[in-house]
Amino acid sequence: MSVKIRLKRMGSKKNPFYRIVVADSRSPRDGRFIAQVGTYNPLTEPAQVKLEEEDILGWLNNGAQPSDTVKNILSKAGIMKKYHEAKFTK
């Protein structure tokens, strides 16, 4: 089972709001997910992001692969840097 950290689209038409979820890569974009680890609202200025850092680091350490967009969000929040430091300083 390949696990991804990706965006799940919520909100109404032309008013997107995203949940950052951990899901099996075979499940649909807005379908079944394993865990919710954050939210992302691109319409606010600046974009509003809420992340559960410990949960995300745990999933990354267990082999979950972030999507490109989620990887950018995590990089801006500094989580990817912490993950790489922990991974390569063992």
UniProtKB/Swiss-Prot annotation:
The lineage of its organism: Bacteria, Bacillati, Bacillota, Bacilli, Lactobacillales. This is Small ribosomal subunit protein bS16. InterPro entries: Ribosomal_bS16 (IPR000307), Ribosomal_bS16_dom_sf (IPR023803). GO terms for biological process: translation. One of its GO terms (molecular function) is structural constituent of ribosome. Belongs to the bacterial ribosomal protein bS16 family. Keywords: Ribonucleoprotein, Ribosomal protein. The gene is rpsP. GO terms for cellular component: cytoplasm; small ribosomal subunit. PANTHER family: 30S RIBOSOMAL PROTEIN S16, SMALL RIBOSOMAL SUBUNIT PROTEIN BS16M. It holds the Pfam family Ribosomal_S16.
